[in-house]
Amino acid sequence: YMKQHFTRIPPARPIVLLRKCCEVEVDIERMLEDLSPNNARVGVMLPYSPLHSLLLAHFDLLVMTSANEREEPISGTDEEVLPSLGEVDFILTHTRRIWNKCDDSVMLVHHHEGLEDRAVMLRRARGFVPVPLQLPHPSAQEILCCGGDLKNVFALVRGANAYLSAHLGDLENAAAFENFAMQIERMQDMFRIKPSLIVHDLHPAYHSTQYALRSTIQRKLGVQHHHAHLAACLAENQHEGRALGIIFDGTGYGTDGTIWGGEFLLGDVAQCERVGRFAPLTMPGGEQSIRDPWKMALGALLPILGRTEAVECVAKRAPELRQSVALLTLAMPMVDF
């Protein structure tokens, strides 16, 4: 149903985001739109287990989704998952408990005519972890890197090996945070790593930061969020020198105590200089506006259009939000818009 080259897909068979093809029957086109509305791509996965092969012996195509609640970690037992399923026609279960919870890996393949396909890993999980990534310079000490709060992944470092966890979700969810702490203990035991340094995000309210600050590991190091993005990009491309990093990220606690967003950072993996940035915006509703883009749009429009016209501009494009927009602006401090 989709045109895509699979020459770069690894044998672990991750979910691959494929571009929808317009040259399909109407009912298939409608099905694809229902699966991923307003999205040019759909996730496709080949069978990677004997159970999948048995099921697909009777079906040409299966639409699959996870059994866990949104933002919740994978359920490991029948007792955890069955109460949340509600009314379903059939349940296929097994007595084996899921001991090491791991989401599916997700990959995107870039295809350009005349060029070799390039596979980009968007979520490194099942089939890829905990196989370590190789570092260009060995570390003299064992390190625990806690990661951020959203779409969390932590890492353990020993020598030239960086052992990344699977995708753990958003840590503001209590069950996800509990799983985060448990997975750290399990991986430390698995690889017999005893960190002497713990690295965390600068954001003081991040659950991962608070975990690090409460840790018994004495040496702690805070890293600015956007600098971490720059360092990750340099490492992924095996670039050891300086570079200009343009980081368009939703949120990051800055070294000046404000929330950063679109940043131009000049530096390397060890240090960087903030040489440019987007103009600061009002964040209606605080950091919650990061999850609701219309609030950020409202914050950008307020100083340009004023309160009344900004509300009308946002409400015109999303009429269902008119009341919410109006109430939010009324709740904001009276400033000279």
Question: Which residues does each predicted region cover?
Answer:
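Acidic, glycine-enriched active-site microenvironments
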Residues: Y1-F337
